Amino acid sequence: MNARLTGLGLNLLSFAVGIGGWYLLTATGAVVLPGPVDVLERAVTLLLNGQLVGDIFASLRRVLSGFVLGVALAIPVGFLMGWYRIARSPIEPWVQFFRMIPPLAVIPLAIVTLGIDESPKIFVIFLASFLSSVVATYQGVISVDRTLINAARVLGAKDATIFARVIVPASVPFILVGVRIGLGSAWATVVAAELIAAQSGLGYRMQQAQLYYDLPTIFVSLVTIGILGLFMDRLLQAADRRLTQWQERA
């Protein structure tokens, strides 16, 4: 408990120092950017007129849709690649091929083929989340200590039992790392997608604000994305601690 309180205190201190440094830089004119007070005032205005809430829900809907679909497909595909060599050979090269292509580069193609509605945005988010999570899951399966597998076989365990009792638990830390990376990729991708083709969302709001050099609104969107991403990442960290209680931690 004391360690958690200390960590929380250091987190809050870090944020306070960061905001204080931001305030000093803008107040002294060292950088020509809006200060924390200006950004807070604009955030209140956007909250009261409903724009910020609408943009948050629009971006969250896209992120969660693509992210959940990507992870839901990545985990079984990753296990399939890692557990069955006959499946690994035809699938793994394609995964690595598409992993080398930035999801943002797919946005124009997705818009041309899927239209300008929600489909292309969700697709590129799905792709970014899938590629991050599938590689982590695959790596987790092939990294399982062979001694554990051989010991289970000596004790008479069948393949299904080994998979459920050895492979899956040992792979969970890798999977959760991939999921967290996929979450970051999902947020980066949704902002880029909204910058190009959207009528709502935090990325769309930044693009509109850029046209009028509205820096406070741009900062509101940036800070909101950071807060939402941090909150979702903390939820995944909590799930990680609960699912991997057996694992020794530094």
UniProtKB/Swiss-Prot annotation:
Keywords, sorted A to Z: Cell inner membrane, Cell membrane, Membrane, Transmembrane, Transmembrane helix, Transport
Membrane association type: Multi-pass membrane protein
Cellular component terms (Gene Ontology): plasma membrane
Superkingdom field: Bacteria
Listed InterPro entries: MetI-like, MetI-like_sf
TM regions (residue ranges): 12-32, 63-83, 94-114, 122-142, 172-192, 211-231
Subunit text: The complex is composed of two ATP-binding proteins (BRA1187), two transmembrane proteins (BRA1188) and a solute-binding protein (BRA1186).
Protein name stated in the entry: Probable ABC transporter permease protein BRA1188/BS1330_II1179
